[in-house]
Amino acid sequence: MGIRKKLKKKICEYLLKKEIFTSTKTDVNKILSFLNMVRPSPLDIENIRVGGDNDGGYVVPNDFQGIKYCFSPGVGSISKFENDLTKKKIKCFLADYSVNPKFENNLIDFDKKFIGASSYENYLNLNDWIEKKLDGESNNDLMLQMDIEGDEYEVINSLNDKTLKKFRIILIEFHQLHYLFDNFMFKQIDKAFKKIMKLFHCTHIHPNNSVDFIFEDKNIIIPPLLEFSFLRKDRGNIIDKNLS
């Protein structure tokens, strides 16, 4: 994580701990409706863990057959997840301007760029990045694994539906979820999740193991970091609607 993003994270945590909001507080009913929207659905496809048991691993719907590529913006010190995917013959495209990793795996391709909502300077728009890497190849079964320190909302909201539908599986670490209590930020977060939930089932939610700060208001407790797993709706069926 770059210095700018570390500072931004600390400022956000400080403001929320002091109950300082950039706008009005979000109505509690809106938050409850949001939480109901994103809760996981029991599907006829099991989840398995890919990558490490701690940071670097994800709980993923076990539906890999036919997936050729995974796009993975945000690169950590451990890339066990991507290495495990390559054992399934899935090529992984990684991007992050803040690191200089060395990979000896020919199924891992790295770009020294941040992935953002638009392409400029050291940033590359996700739509543009995917088009560049696929180079005209028609592929409607990709994976997206994203950990970009709070920029995920702008990136998701900038995605066109054509690109979003190409992903069969989406794994995202969502940051700054404590800002659901801030009405302005709630709108941005809610918009991104509604875009995903229109096309995908949520299959799993897991708090990040490194979280040391949790925000609570009106008996609603929200960690700032949650890992979400999604499966495109045409790939799985809800097995018990009473639990969904």
What are the functions of these language-model segments?
Residues M1-S244:
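Phosphate/nucleotide-binding beta-alpha loop and adjacent structural elements of enzyme active sites
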